[in-house]
């Protein structure tokens, strides 16, 4: 006969095994995700250096940060001539570093283009909620402008389908400011970020 003690011991062992499996699986996925992002960062840094293009890249996450002044006029969401000139150099380097990399190209699920603003108020009588939503609109429209330029410009025709499947946009308003010594750095907070979202369980 199986005693109640034996039954409970067996159940505990089953739960322990399930917990360990889940824990290890999550850690493997995180390791793969971190490795892919580190790989993308290294590949992009090398490509940008070769092509003499400047960008701020987080070596651990692969996130690219582009200052608003590189792309837009103040409080505008249409790309400036300077912005188009910059993207004409940056985007081919960015795309090539991702889609010509054998390790990365099958692991990328989405490319998130995310707009950010600072928390300074627009001129006029607006409530805090209205100010936040105006910044939301500006940040979203700026992300859209970059994505639109990335997809529509001629040099990406070889990757057109891939970009349409992966590029998504998001407006973060002033929700994630860049802090320096505990205070918001307005200039650094106004930016467009490009982030990679990796597929899960890719061998």
Enumerate the language-model features and the residues they cover.
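Short beta-strand/turn micro-motifs at beta-sheet edges
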Residues: 54, 100-102, 181-183
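Periplasmic OmpA-like peptidoglycan-binding domain that tethers envelope proteins to the cell wall
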Residues: 81, 114-201
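Short terminal targeting/anchoring segments
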Residues: 1-54, 59
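Short, solvent-exposed beta-strand/turn patches at coil↔beta or beta↔helix junctions
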Residues: 60-91, 120-135
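Soluble periplasmic/extracytoplasmic beta-strand elements of cell-envelope proteins
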Residues: 54-56, 63-69, 110-114, 168-170, ...
